[in-house]
């Protein structure tokens, strides 16, 4: 049975009687933002959130490696520690907590790839995106530096939480893992923050941070054995800067190119395929 969409309704700006409204696209360059305290408050929130994220997660990784080190913890060390599951929970849980805390201030990006995807979708201006990325990168460096400062011996011994392509995996495999993992994350961000979903679920404020944190958890389970899981260029940069190892630096490009490609694909998929305006395509017919 055929079903027609009313073209006049579409041309008027969307379906009538909607209980939500799409926000207008952010300007590409908004110089006026530089004079607003709300921008700098958001930048500070991104810095602090990324610092806390890196401190907790890298400390968890270092602690796990120490607990499973037979030379330090005895012959049964392999059976102790939080395991990969615990590491994945640390990353996913911290993202859930920090997105919940900062969503109303900065949007809770905590990741340059997320910021890049939202910029491509015109959710944030170029000025805000660049300041967020700088704050996230600096926060990540400071967070890892705190771990090194408090656990200097363990930090150097157990790799500093740096991302590298693991032995047995090719560069292409590592890059693909980062692209797909970041796509999952950024796609989840777009879906969880969709205006239509927010209008329906606004009475349950945890429903946006929860799937985002869970996406981070699931991606870590899949990609920790391959790359240690980047999907966040700031996280990878912070560990590389403080650890300062040649292998971490030689693989660093993977943890920027991969996440940015994954974020771009997710943004295009959400904006062009899932949220495409009917105005751009004329009338539609469904023969379902």
Curated annotation (Swiss-Prot):
Identify the Pfam families for this entry.
MIP (PF00230)
Q: Can you tell me where the transmembrane regions are?
A: 42-62, 81-101, 130-150, 172-192, 206-226, 254-274
Example of a GO cellular component annotation carried by this entry: membrane
Location of the protein in the cell: Cell membrane
* PROSITE patterns tied to this protein: MIP (PS00221)
Its record classes its membrane topology as: Multi-pass membrane protein
Q: Where the protein is mainly located, per its record?
A: membrane
What family does this belong to? Belongs to the MIP/aquaporin (TC 1.A.8) family. PIP (TC 1.A.8.11) subfamily.
Domain comment quoted from the record: Aquaporins contain two tandem repeats each containing three membrane-spanning domains and a pore-forming loop with the signature motif Asn-Pro-Ala (NPA).
Q: What is this protein called?
A: Aquaporin PIP2-6
Q: In the record, what lineage is assigned to the organism producing the protein?
A: Eukaryota, Viridiplantae, Streptophyta, Embryophyta, Tracheophyta
């Amino acid at each position: 049975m055929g079903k027609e969409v009313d073209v006049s309704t579409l041309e008027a700006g969307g379906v009538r009687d909607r209980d939500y409204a799409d926000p207008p696209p952010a300007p590409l360059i908004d110089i006026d933002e530089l004079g607003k305290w709300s921008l700098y408050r958001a930048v500070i929130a991104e810095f602090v959130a990324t610092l806390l994220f890196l401190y907790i997660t890298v400390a968890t990784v270092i602690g796990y490696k120490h607990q499973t080190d037979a030379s330090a913890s005895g012959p049964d060390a392999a059976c102790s520690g939080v395991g990969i599951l615990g590491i994945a929970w640390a990353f996913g849980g911290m993202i859930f907590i920090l997105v919940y805390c900062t969503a109303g201030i900065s949007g809770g990006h905590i990741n340059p790839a997320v910021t890049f995807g939202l910029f491509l979708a015109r959710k944030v201006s170029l000025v805000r995106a660049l300041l967020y990325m700088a704050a996230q990168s600096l926060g990540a460096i400071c967070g890892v530096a705190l771990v090194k400062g408090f656990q200097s011996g363990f930090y150097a011994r157990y790799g500093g939480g740096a991302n590298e392509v693991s032995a047995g995996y090719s560069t292409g495999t590592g890059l693909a893992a980062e692209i797909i993992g970041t796509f999952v994350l950024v796609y989840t961000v777009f879906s969880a923050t969709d205006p239509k979903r927010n209008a329906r679920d606004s009475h349950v404020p945890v429903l946006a941070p929860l799937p985002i944190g869970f996406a981070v958890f699931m991606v870590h389970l899949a990609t920790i054995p391959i790359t240690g899981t980047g999907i966040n260029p700031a996280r990878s940069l912070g560990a590389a800067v403080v650890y300062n190892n040649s292998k971490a630096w030689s693989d660093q490009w993977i943890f920027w190119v991969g996440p940015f490609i994954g974020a771009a694909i997710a943004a295009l998929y959400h904006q062009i395929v899932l949220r495409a305006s009917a105005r751009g395509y004329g009338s539609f017919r469904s023969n379902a």
